[in-house]
Each structure stands twice: as C-alpha cells, then as structure tokens.
Amino acid sequence: MQVRSRGDYEIAGREIVAEGADLRVSVLTLAEGQCVPWHYHSAITDSFVCLEGPMVVETRAPRRLYRLEPGERCAVPPKTAHYVHGEDGGACKFLIVQGVGIYDFVPVG
C-alpha cells in the first residue's frame, strides 16, 4: 500500500511509533525507485537508523553521503538539506527520530 507523506511524496509505508508536540519516531519503507526528496527542517534533527537496506542519506552544505547498512545510523542537523533513498534505487526501511522542535518539511529544488 502506497502512502502520501507530509512532504507530498509517495512512499511504500509509514508507521508512527510515537509522536508528541516536539518529537516524532516513525518507521518508513521505501520501495524500489522511491525516495524522500531533497528538503530540510528549520528546527529539528533527523536521526536515521537503517533497518533494511542498504540505504543512502545525502546532504548538501556540507556535502556528504552516508551509506548505511542495517543497524548503522546517522543524524542530519537542522537547516541541512538532505535526500534519502535505497542504494542504487533499491528498497529500504529505516527508523527515523525527528526532534526536538516543531516539525516542518521545506522542499529544496
């Protein structure tokens, strides 16, 4: 089942584990060819833990590429544009902790 994300992109699945006023924990599933497009958050840090993969988290300014195998993690601080996808367009599944702060999704072209 495809689901619409809050950033208006389609992903294979989203399970909300916990959500409060300034913290969210979710499990996201990306099917082959899907991604979380380039965006940033004004106030929150995204902390990723790969559950199934490999997966890739790319950032701009600083330009980095994090290749994560299951069990590995990385964090992207506020105001850092990032893009998430499975390696070579493959499927992946990850836990994401978003906070502490008010959630927003600012697309980046």
PLM regions: where:
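A short, N-terminal "cap"/entry segment at the start of jelly-roll beta-barrel domains
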Residues: M1-V27, P37-W38, C74, P107-G109
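Short strand-connecting beta-turns/loops that link adjacent beta-strands
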Residues: A21-D22, A43, P62, G89-G90
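Short, conserved beta-strand element in jelly-roll/cupin
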Residues: L30, S42-V57, V97
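Short beta-strand His + acidic residue motifs that chelate non-heme Fe in jelly-roll/DSBH
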Residues: W38, V57-E58, V76, H82-G89
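A short hydrophobic beta-strand segment most commonly corresponding to one strand
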Residues: S47, G90-F105
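Short acidic-glycine-tyrosine-enriched beta hairpin
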Residues: P62-P78
